[in-house]
């Protein structure tokens, strides 16, 4: 599936480092669902929600929402995000890239649905027009 984990990490690091950059992400309609890594999507949503309510989104604030476990050190992960943060001017480009890759994944899922549904003749009550209509709905959501 199309994705770019490094772009996700660098974008999150930049947002944690400089909360004002969220406006550049909002220009691209990016939200947590667009992240390939679901954990990154959760972090993005927490940042966005925090900033929308007038709070800051720094490491200390964010790590309260995510638990450490034996295999994963959340403190170290957030520190690495900030250390490897993208430069501010690249944020809109990274945001657009993450959004575009999410749309591409959605296109792949939709074409898989279209192909599977077209071959599935076991449901007599579903016509080709029904499949086309459902595919159009998925594409234009």
Regions from the PLM with identified roles:
Residues 1-103:
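Noncatalytic partner-interaction/assembly domains of nucleic-acid and motor enzyme complexes
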Residues 82-141:
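Interdomain "pre-motor" coupling segment immediately N-terminal to P-loop NTPase/helicase cores
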């Amino acid at each position: 599936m199309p994705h770019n984990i490094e772009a996700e990490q660098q974008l999150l690091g930049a947002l944690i480092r400089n909360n004002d950059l969220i406006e550049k992400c909002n220009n691209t309609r990016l939200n947590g669902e667009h992240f390939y890594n679901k954990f990154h999507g959760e972090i993005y949503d927490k940042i966005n929600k925090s900033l929308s309510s007038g709070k800051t989104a720094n490491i200390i604030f964010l790590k309260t929402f995510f638990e450490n476990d034996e295999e994963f050190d959340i403190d170290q992960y957030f520190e690495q995000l900030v250390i490897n943060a993208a430069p501010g001017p690249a944020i809109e480009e990274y945001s657009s890239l993450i959004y575009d890759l999410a749309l591409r994944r959605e296109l792949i899922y939709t074409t898989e649905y279209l192909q599977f549904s077209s071959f599935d003749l076991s449901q007599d009550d579903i016509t080709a027009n029904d499949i086309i209509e459902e595919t159009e709905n998925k594409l234009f959501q």
